[in-house]
Amino acid sequence: MSKKLKINNLKGLHARPSAKLVKAANKFDADIYVSKGDQTVNGKSIMSIMQLAAARGQEITVKAVGPDAEEAIESISRLVKSKFFEE
């Protein structure tokens, strides 16, 4: 299962939001991948997430595979929509 999400927080997917995304992803029994354009990375690796350098207004796709896939997608979606609780 996958979902497209728009990055809306002011500074984009920098260190703090990346850490929050990875922390959320690691709570679930699922393989999680995050894509921007043609680049796909491991959603449970902070260094990989930061390499995406997703800026405000850009779209990412979150894909999850495994027993907790649906719950993982919903949790990450809520986090992104909340602007990572930064604003």
Can you name each region flagged by the protein language model?
Residues K6-G57, E86:
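Compact, glycine-rich, soluble single-domain proteins
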